[in-house]
Amino acid sequence: MNQFHTGGTAEIATSEKIGIRHLYISPGHNFFGHYGGPPDHHPIVEVPAIECVAGRGLRGDRFIDYKENYKGQITFFAWETYESICVHLSVWKRSPSVFRRNVITTGIDLTTWIGREFEIQGVHFRGTEECRPCYWMDLAFADGAEEYLKGRGGLRGVILTSGVLRVNV
């Protein structure tokens, strides 16, 4: 159940029921900036914790210091969406890491955080927009993934306060 409190001028959404199932970082871009060409082959690494650096991104990730005020310093993807796409496309042997989102959450509808500030494990974020799927999703996951993920591709955000997120599920 979400709780709301006012801190300064912003309303911050918090929830004690948000789970973090997986955390991922990657040192390089496989698909981003590769439109019309082949993907690259940078690994995506699962980690037990990630360091969020306010205004910059995730320590060790490809988007840290990408550009000033970048709206995708961190990305979130719902475990529930992962489960539903696996069922919908009958794909059972792909990790959620193929979607190249940083934080795999459970227990929250990520679309409710678009345009809002929220807090997870003491770290504050602002949801900026849906992390829209691209045509690479069909290659990375399965045919039909891009279409299925429209409107549920995850959340892009900026990091407002520094801190550490940890897997807790």
Spans of model-derived segments:
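Electropositive, beta-rich accessory/interaction domains or terminal extensions
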Residues: 1-120, 129
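Short glycine/proline-centered loop/turn elements that form peptide/ligand docking sites
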Residues: 160, 164-169
